Amino acid sequence: FPGGGFTSADHEKFSEMRRALANAGFVVAAAEYRVVPDKFPAILEDAKSAVRYLRAHAEEYGIDPDRIGVLGDSAGGYLSQMTGVTNGEKQFDKGDWLNVSSDVQAAVTIYGLSDLTTIGEGFGPEIDKVHESPASTEALLVNGPAFRTYPGASIMADRKAALAASPLGHVDGSEPPFLILHGALDPLVSPTQSAKLYRALKAKNVDAEYVLVDNAQHGDLPWFQKPVIERVVNWFVKVLKPVKAEESEGAVL
C-alpha cells in the first residue's frame, strides 16, 4: 500500500521494494485506495477488497491463498497495520468477493501511524497545534471536511471515533506476525507511533519485531537502500516461507 498522507495513493511508488520481493519469489501487487475527502473506513474497505481479490484469483496468479502478506509506508503503513489488526472483523468487508477471507498472514509497516490522536507526539507544541486542526489529514480522514453547516472537527473531538480508526484500537492478540520499521530521525510521524504498536502487540503475545533505523527520516534515501529492503524481504521469506517454484507462491500486497 503506497503512502501519500491520506491524500494520494500512487501504486507506482516503492518500486525497488516491489522488485526485490518479486525477485525473491513472491507475487507482488500494488493497490490504490480511496483517500480524503472519503472518510474512514473507506480506505480499509478498499485494502480488504484488494486482499479478497487476490485470494479469489489465487489460481490465476499462482498465489497460495493461505500465505498473503501486506506492506505499506506512512499512510500505507497505517493501512497495512489496520489490515493486519482487523483480521476477522467482518464489518470492514464491503464490495466484491465476499465469499473469501480478507485476513492476512503477515504485515509490514514502515513509518506508519498506530494512533491518529498522537501523530506529532514529542515534536513540540507547534506541531501539536497542526495536528489538532480540523484541516489535518487525520481529522479529515475520521471526521470529513467542512461542508455547508458542518465546520469540520479536530481529531481530538471524538476520541472514540479516532481510536476506532486507529490500529491500536483493534489489537486483541489475534494479529498475524508484524515487522515494524521507523526512522530514528522521522520529522513527520513520531517514532513513538511504531513503538506503541510494538508494545501493544507484544503485550498480547503477538509475534512482532521493531526496527528503529538509525539516521533515517521519512521516505528519504535509507528506505530505498539494500539494508532496509533486504531486512523486509528476508522477514517475509521467514514468515511466509516461499515454497518450490512449481508450487504456489505467497503474495505481498
Where are these regions (language model features)?
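Catalytic histidine neighborhood in serine/cysteine hydrolases
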Residues: K202-G219
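Acidic catalytic loop of the alpha/beta-hydrolase fold
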Residues: L116, L185-V189
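Catalytic active-site module of serine/aspartate enzymes centered on a nucleophile-bearing elbow/loop
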Residues: Q225-L253
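Primarily recognizes the serine-hydrolase "nucleophile elbow" in alpha/beta-hydrolase
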Residues: A24, S49-I127
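Catalytic nucleophile-loop/oxyanion-hole region of alpha/beta-hydrolase
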Residues: A9-E12, M17, A29-P65, P222-V228
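Short beta-strand/loop motif that positions the catalytic acidic residue
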Residues: S174, L179-H182, D186
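Short alpha-helix in the alpha/beta-hydrolase fold that links the catalytic acid
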Residues: K13, P167, P176, S190-A203
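Mobile cap/lid helix-loop segments that gate and shape the active-site cleft of serine hydrolases
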Residues: E121-H170, P176, A203
